C-alpha cells in the first residue's frame, strides 16, 4: 500500500513539473508579465480553475498591503497581476484560497490558505512564475525565475 501511495505522489509531482514550469512559453507569450501564477489540482490531475489569488507586498513597517488579486482561468493560470513598473524590489506574499476551491468541489480541506512568501527583484529585474500543486491536505510550490524577454 505504501508503494502505491509513493507512486501516486511521484506521478503527481511529475505532472506538476511538466505542466508548471514551461520556461519557453512564459517568456515568449507573456513577455510583459513579471508575475504569473499557476495552480494544479493533484487529486484530479488538472489545472485548478477559479482559485482566488491575492498578492501582498510587505511595507517598510512590516505590515502586508494588498498589491494585486485575481482568479485562475480554466487553465489554472493568472496573468497580468501587475506591470514591470509596479513590480519593484521587495518581499511579496501570494495567497491561494485553497479552502474555497476544495469546498466548491464538495471536500473539506485542512488548509484555509496556502501562502508563498518570496523576495523579488533583489538581483535585478526578473519575471516570476509561482506554481502550486494542491490537494485537500497538502500543497507544494515551486518558482521559475527568469530574465525578462524583450
From Swiss-Prot:
What keywords were assigned to this record?
Hormone, Secreted, Signal, Sulfation, Thyroid hormone, Transport
Where is the major localization of this protein? secreted
Query: SMART domains from the entry?
Result: TR_THY
The record's subcellular location field reads: Secreted
Keyword Transport in the entry? The reply is yes
Q: Which family does it belong to?
A: Belongs to the transthyretin family.
| Entry protein name | Transthyretin
Give the source species: Crocodylus porosus
